Amino acid sequence: MKQQGVTIWLTGLSGAGKTTITHALEQKLREAGYALEVLDGDIVRTNLTKGLGFSKEDRDTNIRRIGFVANLLTRNGVIVLVSAISPYRDIRDEVRGTIGNFVEVFVNAPLNVCEERDVKGLYKKARAGEIKSFTGIDDPYEPPLNPEIECRTDLETLEESVTKIWQKLEELGYLAKPVAI
């Protein structure tokens, strides 16, 4: 059976758990034999979108470029895991429309929880005024209105979040369901 491509787009505040969920889901998908690629927002910024700042226009350009690569992979039968803050609803919706096979995962944790998890000290720097236009502090995050999946990482375990995503992908027909014998 030929694998169907899909982009699984994890969005949420810095520290919400996007990368953690992405790595766990990646491992489970690889173990099951699926072809996939991961596009992590931090890694993409240092390679594909180097030189872009954090204005709305630059952030939109960043997300469009990630979406462009995700679309190329998706239409060639690859499962693409995108882990990116992608704070603006309009650009996420634009990318969804371009890709088609698109599953939005809202990785949701309250701001105070994200700040507690902040090992890099980014929130502290943003609150001190050392980082400008930091999402959730002095730049908005627009939560998805109708994501296919919401993972409440302050209330559920990593395993519960991954299982929730896996089950939705099966339900939508992107993953083959095991055959009962």
Curated annotation (Swiss-Prot):
Pathway: Sulfur metabolism; hydrogen sulfide biosynthesis; sulfite from sulfate: step 2/3
Family matches, as InterPro entries: APS_kinase, P-loop_NTPase, Sulf_AdTrans/APS_kinase
Pfam families linked to this entry: APS_kinase
Superkingdom as given in the UniProt entry: Bacteria
Record: residues binding ATP: 12-19
Keyword field: ATP-binding, Kinase, Nucleotide-binding, Phosphoprotein, Transferase
Catalytic activities: adenosine 5'-phosphosulfate + ATP = 3'-phosphoadenylyl sulfate + ADP + H(+)
EC number assigned by the record: 2.7.1.25
Class of the enzyme per the UniProt entry, highest EC level: transferase
Gene Ontology MF terms: adenylylsulfate kinase activity; ATP binding; sulfate adenylyltransferase (ATP) activity
Active site: 86 (phosphoserine intermediate)
Entry keyword annotation includes Phosphoprotein: yes
UniProt cross-references to HAMAP family, sorted A to Z: Adenylyl_sulf_kinase
Name of this chain's protein: Adenylyl-sulfate kinase
Source species: Rippkaea orientalis (strain PCC 8801 / RF-1)
